[in-house]
Amino acid sequence: MKQKKESFVNHQIKSAILLTMDTIRVTLEPSQSGDAKNWKIANEGGEWPLTIIEVADHTIDLLLSKPYDFDQTNIVVCDSDTCYVEVRDVVRTDEFDDFFYYSGNDLGVTYTKEQTKVAVWAPIATKVNILLYKKWHDETGERYTCSRDGKGVWRAELDGDYESIWYLFEVYVNQSWRKVIDPYAKFLSINGQKAMIGDHAKTQLAQWPKLEPLSSPNDMIIYELHIRDFTIGRNNGIKHKGQFVGMTEEGTMDPHHLITGIDYLERMGITHVELLPVQEFGSIDESNRQDPNHYNWGYDTTHFFVPEGSYATDPYDGYSRNRELKLLIASLHKKQIRVIMDVVFNHLYIWEDSPLEQIVPGYFFRHTDENEMSNGTGVGNDFAAERNMARKMIVDAISYWIEEFHVDGFRFDLMGILDTETMKQVAKETKKATKDIFILGEGWDLPTSYPPELRAITDQARELPQIAFFQDRFRDGIKGSTFESIQPGFVSGNDFSIDEIVSGVRGSMELFSSPKQAINYVEAHDNHTLWDKLKEIHPHEETELLQKRHRLATSIVMLSQGIPFLHAGQEWFRTKYGCENSYNQPDWVNQFDWNQRAYFEKTVNYIRGLIKIRRAHPAFRMETYKAIKEHFHLMLVESDCIAYHLRNLGELDRWDDIIVIHNASLYKKRIPLPKNTDWYVVVDDHAASLIPLSKIGEDCVNVSPLSTWVCVNYKTK
């Protein structure tokens, strides 16, 4: 090595790149030819011949005569000319992936009072150190050398008690030193500047509440909310605004003496809260988190294993965020509400700066055939979950959140970017848990550089029977196109969406293996709220008519086969004042307006009534398509009205027969009912109740415009 350095300035060789496990591509300066024959590779262990296998314009492909030494700095030698070998394209080969796959479960930090062990997967690094700091803001650390194993894992053992010591890794990759955060870090400093060696026992709760069994995913009612939105408002009675612990506060009320916060969630009767991202994300300065203009949904993850610091009472404390998220989850469990995490594994925030790219350049992110960054996510990078160690990282993270934080489910953002094998491995891992874990995701078919037949998109749903998918076709059929703001749907005057409505209310059996795969919704954090969408379509319509359309849309979701999903505030016509994408808008756009909730308490109670009916009656949440085909009978299908009969329910339900009518017209509909039985109304245009609202005295029912009615009989019960 040393004798070659002085000739490096010759610059006849422009670059040397390791393409595969046995091939180096040399690029020559334009003034040079490829006539030279005497090619070698050299490192501190000696030098070995290279064989020319292909010559092209200013490039030569060279075949190695022995396995490449990944633990050495290598140079290509030709006569008096030399060039360092850059380990680059090879990391995206199957051979590299298989050779360096590490199946162990000790990546990151393993702490005891007697010894701390650290491990980082850095297969192309030739040197790795760990730097220890007494304070998170220290600039100079104490350096310890790590040793490498055959799978590219670098380790160090630190004798003594290193609890609450901060650390970074220092890796030497492609002739460059880089200081990086541990990708498997479990505790972080403010803004994730350093990782902390922590004792998990210091964040454990004395006892976790016991959850009552949930017999089936079909029993779920999901309620999606953002930590800051839900707690930041001035009129909610919550003290710890914008923080995890704000959602643990009981007994909070608004100025109208109506309950708020976690008590409100319990009163609604939902079974699951889906939290928008709580993994550490990069767009918020955690030291300035109370600024009302300093807001983000959090879909810009930087660390897979650590909670977001801006929601902690003290983001400078490495333990605070972990302890307080656990307290939040336990508080919801106490109310018998399960927790779904919205996880972002499809991309990373500023990929160039991520520790994954710094440690193993080119491995963790998907590339096109032209070696450009794949960008199906639309944010500059796609995570290459199909690679062994990327997939392992996702599965490890899921396992960690279940075991350490008692999470009950995961919503995979842009799941269609990820591959089906990864999602199968995730589902398999969740089966190891001591409780049922629910997985759902966005199965959008996005333009990433990976074959669609191998990705977790809706068209592959039958390959993933344990995973649920957002049913966007039903969504758009109900309210109109999400991406064309003025295009109407069933509830707003579209005569051509009835087929999607019929499919959706039956559980979307054309798409899925079972009803539990269908996530039915009309509103989520993305895009316009339902209210704002309806205002776009009908800008001059009376408020009362808009409210009827809104209630109709929500009632369709709540009564359909599959799993209903509500966006927080949907039950009281939540608005974001026309903002179509509020991901970084100020609090006044995104926050929960509890005054509006109070004003529309009657509608809140209407949705609560639908929730009670659904939870009390299995006929609305049948387990199989076989059962749906047996009991579901279409009575009427018109462009603006659908009526169906859930019949012969027998032992399935306390009600013998149920008739559901969704009238999207501006006129009253007269719907015939089966004769020779007593029919009772439990849902009309004003109320939804387990106790009948009225008895129907004839063989038909007059259904009000823009409303849902449910009629039942229970003659044998």
What are these regions (language model features)?
Residues 546, 559, 600, 610-611, ...:
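C-terminal accessory region downstream of the catalytic core in glycan-modifying enzymes
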Residues 28-36, 121-127, 665-666, 675-677:
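Short proline/glycine-enriched turn/loop motifs at strand-loop junctions of beta-rich domains
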Residues 122, 163-167, 693-717:
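C-terminal beta-strand-rich structural cap/linker in extracellular carbohydrate-active enzymes
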Residues 120, 169, 225, 275, ...:
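Conserved, mostly hydrophobic/aromatic
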Residues 228-405, 415-418, 423-434, 438:
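Substrate-binding/active-site clefts of carbohydrate-active enzymes
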Residues 191-202, 427-573, 577-583, 625, ...:
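Conserved alpha/beta catalytic core and glycan-binding cleft of carbohydrate-active enzymes
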Residues 29-48, 126-134, 141:
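Short, surface-exposed alpha-helix to beta-strand junction/turn motifs within ectodomains of secreted
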Residues 2-15, 20, 56-117, 138, ...:
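The feature marks proteins involved in alpha-glucan
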